[in-house]
């Protein structure tokens, strides 16, 4: 090459290089923007927990940074999801007088937006007879589905949802099938490979040439997201909204993937499944485009782009249209709040009793505890009840004896920091030398029984053996079927003891391990301070967890303790009782200024929320005088249980005139009935959370609708306990409240449908309604509706705190999540002092104007 040619080549290279670099830089920027939009969409999805650890979750949790009405508009336009109560439900409340003219007038006065819009009571009443004018933005799949030339028996949207859902079910299953897919390359790669071998999907969707399009799919999820989003030609400003709308078409599986991400973050890790699910759902739209001609594609792009150009305007229009729905939401809440305010003021004036307290009983804050606490206090003035989060402040995971089935026993917001295991502990100290040998024997016995059971059940999971298994084992299942058809009076079963020799079950006790004495003392001090039990302890202190009892119920964990991650509170109560009864721990507490009298004994117990019976644990460890007091309590428990069962009987369609024994028998049979879809109502009806001394709610009937947490501001000079209550239990109760709210307002999209049609997916992932569709999240219809009427009223939580205003404001200012909840209308916040109630509204307090209607 000549010198001139070399110089010319260098000049050309120098000229070309800047443009090449700019093109690459522009492409990198585009890819970054796409990744950011995908991440933003993924962050909008709230998690859902597996069936065996089911806890209630606000499905809009990731959107609380926006006002409720804005979220309602987004959900309607992007996902066809209803956030406020349906207008027919509100019309019924108005017609029946549940919402009064005074409630409506007070609401219009309370909402500045309603005043600015000039809404009158007449306007609001008229609006109840029509649906809000809302326009749903289409996705690419919707545009293609509307093509008049499409000839299939099933809409493409339905077919795609079914295919994606079945793929996810196979991929995530770890408990149901003995064969598991290869997961090392991720969900997207598994879906792509599955699709390549699915020769029936083309026939189902009327796309005989889809195989060629599948082969052209990008290899990675990131490339698929870029490939699709670049082709759609949508304005960048709406990318995240479009992608969120895509995820809402498979919201159930998106929520499951969000749970995997949530758990990974608790362990300081990352999880990519939600992004891969988004890529799968996006890629399906592009696949359909590959199967159509260019003219049809061009028309689809034009239609989609025109619709999404107006997305911001449609969202604003929806927000305006839903103002009336927000008015009726508040009016429904004010109708309840009037009665609540009157009760709280009257209770605050009641003088405390003078009888000496012989027993203190700490219950979970769960709304089902409130009627029983009230009944116990009525039955015997010598008992004082307390409200505390049902995990009793123990940040633990529990592993039953001879298993590796480690499970969290604390709120889903937290990660376990300590471990609880089972050990054989004899009651008599002189027998404890033999405990190690008994434990070894128990472990061997249990492992043997598990092995036999697993081999037996495996026969039903291999395809070739399924029918022969049914023929061979059919008669063996008649016993269980008989128990369901003719339910007996069996007590609540304890799965953690399954397979253990009966003679060892009573001395198999859960306890903390790996915790030094100083750490034990610190933990005990924190728990007692949180309960307000730092002085004047009674001779007996009950730690009463709670658990439900039902048969053949995939959602049984949802009726147990949410603070224990869908488990009963037994493990936490028993572990804490053992800890607080340790002499060395008590000595250490003395040094911290917490004097636990030597005669005080802590006793673990469990409230069966289905039958309202109380069961005690480790009673053989109690001294004689405590055993005598426990026997005295049995009559108190029976009397209180009778009262609560009679209160509950009308809502369960039981005979309220039946004898006490007959009512208890009916509830026990109900708890063992495998055909019973409504063993109890769980937390249906929940509407308030009261953080105050028990005196504030003592003696008043709160109808099992209030969470109750004891709190004495005079003992919390630095506000640290209040901060903990507003950032942990308040968030948990908010989650519960909004899951019930969401499942009532949109049972189709945010509820799990009909229990009678449920099929469990992957052993514990969730349920399908029938054999397909999206994974269903939320509560079943039978958990909210009695067949004629809704049992749950969709009210946002009213939080009532008896503490200095400055202390409450300090927590709000310090914690963004709390500020978002109160400022964006996700809950109501009241301050109570003496006989005065005040309402918090964006940094200001105003007198609660709730005159009786």
UniProtKB/Swiss-Prot annotation:
GO-annotated molecular function: zinc ion binding
Membrane topology note: Peripheral membrane protein
Chief location bin: membrane
Amino acids binding Zn(2+): 364, 366, 546, 561
Superkingdom assignment: Bacteria
CC cofactor: Zn(2+)
Gene Ontology cellular component annotations, sorted alphabetically: plasma membrane
Keyword Cell membrane tagged: yes
Region annotation (Disordered) ranges: 1-21
Family: Belongs to the inorganic carbon transporter (TC 9.A.2) DabA family.
PANTHER family, sorted: INORGANIC CARBON TRANSPORTER SUBUNIT DABA-RELATED, UPF0753 PROTEIN AQ_863
Record's subunit section: Forms a complex with DabB.
Reported function: Part of an energy-coupled inorganic carbon pump.
Protein name in the entry: Probable inorganic carbon transporter subunit DabA
Organism: Methylovorus glucosotrophus (strain SIP3-4)
Gene name linked to the record: dabA
